[in-house]
Amino acid sequence: MAATMIFGSFTHDLLGKAMSTIHSAVTAEKDIFSSIKERLERKRHGKICRMKNGSIYIKAASSTKVEKINAAAKKLADDKAAFLKAQPTIVDKIIVNEKIQVVEAEEVHKREDVQTVFFKKTKKRAPKLRATCSSSGLDNLYNAVANIAKASSLRVEVIHKKRVCGEFKQTRFGRALFIDVAHAKGHRRRIDCRMHRREQRTMHMFMRKTTKTEVRSKHLRKGDSGIVLLTQKIKGHLSGVRDEFFIVRGTCDDSLLEARARFSQSITLRATHFSTGDIFWKGFNASFQEQKAIGLDHTCTSDLPVEACGHVAALMCQSLFPCGKITCKRCIANLSNLDFDTFSELQGDRAMRILDVMRARFPSFTHTIRFLHDLFTQRRVTNPNTAAFREILRLIGDRNEAPFAHVNRLNEILLLGSKANPDSLAKASDSLLELARYLNNRTENIRNGSLKHFRNKISSKAHSNLALSCDNQLDQNGNFLWGLAGIAAKRFLNNYFETIDPEQGYDKYVIRKNPNGERKLAIGNFIISTNLEKLRDQLEGESIARVGITEECVSRKDGNYRYPCCCVTLEDGSPMYSELKMPTKNHLVIGNSGDPKYLDLPGEISNLMYIAKEGYCYINIFLAMLVNVDEANAKDFTKRVRDESVQKLGKWPSLIDVATECALLSTYYPAAASAELPRLLVDHAQKTIHVVDSYGSLNTGYHILKANTVSQLEKFASNTLESPMAQYKVGGLVYSENNDASAVKALTQAIFRPDVLSELIEKEPYLMVFALVSPGILMAMSNSGALEFGISKWISSDHSLVRMASILKTLASKVSVADTLALQKHIMRQNANFLCGELINGFQKKKSYTHATRFLLMISEENEMDDPVLNAGYRVLEASSHEIMEKNLSRTVRDILVRLKLVWKIQVNLVYAKALWKIQSRIVPKRADRLARTLQQLVAVSLPEYAQALEKQGESVSRKIFGKHFKCKTQDNMCSF
């Protein structure tokens, strides 16, 4: 037997028998080389790795990976060999499903240097991938969609040349696909379901997901039309089988019909279809016969078309229960979850539309038309009188006390109309009962009209003012410390009080006059007698004619007494009369119906004695409110009272106006609502409320108002309060009618004084509105640059003032092109409304704000009164007054120009020229009236007059006027800069 010797790649055959020892050695050598070869093979398919210390090594591949690589190489070689051995074929068509991407190969440069441990591996850019979809990928997509549709019972539509629709449903056979067939829609056709090849191929992907349960043909019934079953799983005789799937149409002669197959006309007519319509009519007929009316007085006949009856039944169903399908559980759930109002509204809207259809198409069904009309028109009864509802809500909507609460409830229920439920109707009856009781009691009270049971006693408990009990506001003697409020109180004392000189005596201050009479103060009692008898006589005072409790002493609201707004009585019902109020010095006395509290006036005011001027008595109420106002708000409070409250109240205001103003102030400063009032005495004979200050009252016998705090006094601020005292006079500020004239005069003077004009624009900008008094003043302000300066001054702080200046500048341009004075005045008056709307912006601390708004409102009201007269073709007698006003203003301007020194004239011209340089154009009136000419003369003063004056007064005047920034040059006999 021949043996072979192997050493590496060297092989040699040996003759003869080999010994067993030599054979075992050769086998061992063979095993050694095979393991080395296998290890090298794994190294060859391995990858290069680097260790943490930078060393590079080859990581061998696994045996499994090597086997896969060898198998792939063997398969590639076999395929190539098979391709080469195959017979030649003719290729007539090549179809490329995927787009071929051509990538240019880059030239590869081989590294010639030796790789070291510091070699940096470069990253290779991955080629950009493009989204492509092959036929297999598209099949996978269809398969995934089919799985989702089956799991969620979704509807599927396949559209190519025609639309094929299907839906997965849960059946007794499992979850199956149902294809839409024609006979389910009421059409009997020879082909029940048309499906082209492309549509059928796609639909097969979804048919594969249908149930695979074995089904006997006799188990199929109504409602199974369109179900897709596997042909192999159907037991029974089948007719028209197309492929592996069977779409059920119906039966004919015990044969199951395929929906995609074409059948003869006779089979189509004789076939029993498995649609749900037959089931519906079976249930409909059964229930209709069971519930058929009994005791009819006639024999029923078939008079109306059956198809029309079906239409009407469907319309009735849609009007009562609007839905997409009567078998849809989701529609049923949606209708069940609607509230009554929404469901009724939905029914009503559908019923009204369906009624129109029934009247047009099915007029013979009069009973259904009448039923729907009566049912839904009665359910949709509404109250058309919404204007009355809004008016009631406006009058008493905010009142929650009886009987207004009952009226509001009735008003709301009546608005509901047919939506009112039985509970609401029961509440309406209860409210009506309460109204009847109230009216009955009110009638009885009015009929009696007696005050013998009226009692309004003073509370035995003293009012606790928290502002006077805070340790931080009391000194070591327990006296109230005003703090910063004391400084703000000066605004009251400086404007509305006058000082008393004790050296001149107190006689002239004893009598305080009011519009209806007078009252004696106790200020003369500062000088008292040491004789006890005479002192007791002084303490008696001087009594006025005393009156008892009358209707003027009480205040009612809703038929009930408002006790804080009534006069104080004793236990027997008689009025409590005021006694002598002794005077004190430098005190504020608060506490009306209880024990008085004496507060020292602020130490910042000095030790002078102050007394309110005639008509200013109610300022003591605001001074008492200042005690409870926080120190941080004291300054704003006093400014608001001075600039707004006192301006509106006027002289001797009524009590209702004072109470309303207190309510307004309490809104801005809530702490002031709990402030205690000064002593308030009621004089019914003179219809006056006396606000008693620290100088007391010599007269006695007045009634006492029970209101002790500002919040109680605010109850008078109501139009529904039945109180004669609400119209009593209190006291106020004498308004000066010369305020407008003073404002115009100040504005005119400021035009010729640039420094004054700048200060006026900064501190009282609203005075610029008074330029509407005259067209000449308006144009002069525009030429002087005042409006431009104002716009630049306020552009970042107050946009309303910027709009005001812009409107005035525009008006100046419009007025300059007017031909007559009347037309100029008309232009300014017509724009007053717009300017007023831009100007009014809540409360402003500027003193000129109130005057400016009042001036604009006056012009607006005059326009409102004159417009109907002018539109009717008449003229108002204003032209002559305008001419006179212009003459007076012209005379005033000339007087101002005469008084101006030459230095000021030159400086004014400099300012004008500087302003004109900025605004580039000067407004020149087309009609040069008297005032306009006077104002324009100042602008056009020639340089020779200045040069002559400079020669007389010296060069120092030139430096004073022009400074070091301006130089005077002669050019065309005018001054240029």
UniProtKB/Swiss-Prot annotation:
Site (Cleavage): 274-275, 731-732
Similarity section: Belongs to the potyviridae P3N-PIPO polyprotein family.
Peptidase C6 domain boundaries: 609-731
Keyword Transport listed: yes
Motif (Involved in virions binding and aphid transmission): 583-585
BP-aspect Gene Ontology terms: proteolysis; symbiont-mediated suppression of host innate immune response; transport of virus in host, cell to cell; viral translational frameshifting
Entry annotation: catalytic residues: 183 (for p1 proteinase activity), 192 (for p1 proteinase activity), 225 (for p1 proteinase activity), 617 (for helper component proteinase activity), 690 (for helper component proteinase activity)
Lineage: Viruses, Riboviria, Orthornavirae, Pisuviricota, Stelpaviricetes
EC number: 3.4.21.-, 3.4.22.45
Span of domain Peptidase S30: 132-274
Post-translational modification comment from the UniProt entry: Potyviral RNA is expressed as two polyproteins which undergo post-translational proteolytic processing. Genome polyprotein is processed by NIa-pro, P1 and HC-pro proteinases resulting in the production of at least ten individual proteins. P3N-PIPO is cleaved by P1 and HC-pro proteinases resulting in the production of three individual proteins. The P1 proteinase and the HC-pro cleave only their respective C-termini autocatalytically.
Gene Ontology cellular component annotations, sorted alphabetically: host cell plasmodesma
GO MF terms, alphabetically ordered: cysteine-type endopeptidase activity; serine-type peptidase activity
UniProt protein name: P3N-PIPO polyprotein
Free-text note regarding domains: The N-terminus of helper component proteinase is involved in interaction with stylets. The central part is involved in interaction with virions and the C-terminus is involved in cell-to cell movement of the virus.
